[in-house]
């Protein structure tokens, strides 16, 4: 639209708005006459007028929550990865924690059996069917000797991510402050941003063996409590940690619960990788601590333990007030996971658990191959005690370029895709996350590619 036409559209727009301000049913003929007169005088196509009106109106609309979200840095690597594959390149993909193995057959069989029952195809229950919540209670009793009230302290979720985001939506008031480790699984911080809250980032420092530097972590919490206004209302913890693989022992949670009770904040614990452990390590639960239910909830997912990532099943348990808030918001938002999936998940949690050890053994072997072959290639990495990741510091010659540019370079030159550490927080920029989702031979091939890349 030229400048002259724009001026005429603006003239028409202002006059029409003036006419509409005095609009009454009995004056409709006058308004129509005004429109026809203005069109004739200005010699304008009606489409230009409509486009101008809506462009002006919609340009004024802002989406404040979306504006607060940072750019999703993983998208840049994903786009580059797809471009390489479209060009015919063989990309070895360690970028996403997406299990590549099959769901154990007895779980699949139960799903099929349940699907073949017509009554299971209707709406389900937003908090999860009672049998699944009972299975969650059985799992916690067997693994942690923790008793749960199935009606007040357990909600089944569509994966742990859905449950976490909806919990945060339910409990966050505008301006509430949450303490979140950095680096962290991105939604752990961004859920509070979406809910209108704010985030105080706690630097996650590790010991040489990648256990958590607990002294430093508690020091950072105490500083946040002392210096922040308003005082933090929530703390998020995630061990075994994604992305760093950091682990803790039960005394860590005992001290954390004591501080939370004293300082009056809630703890949201994520133990998504609780079963993927190696070398005798056993993941503790915060709910093992006496009195933890006063201040804490905990989430878990079947995605990694049973290779059920696409099934979208998890649960959240613990503090009855927080669980009640999650249950209430879910009652408005969904009707629960497809019932046959819940039935099959019940079997997963309660029947033969040998499949869990088999899946864990697959990751242990991959871990050993990855650590050994990467070190031999000239990239020193630390062997994790848990999770499906290796948190690898960028080799010294490339560290100054940052994790995003290094990830791009590794992809284009070595044909190996990893996740840049900056995507998990500013303190992760010296690292990349490597997911153990390719088989052992592919891992060895990646190491050969990396060795050549580092030498060049």
Where are these regions (language model features)?
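Methionine residue identity
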Residues: 1, 34, 40-41
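Polybasic, lysine-rich low-complexity intrinsically disordered segments
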Residues: 15, 27-30, 48
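PLP-dependent class I/II
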Residues: 46-62, 67-72, 79-92, 98-114, ...
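Conserved N-terminal alpha-helix of the aminotransferase class I/II PLP-enzyme fold
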Residues: 123-158
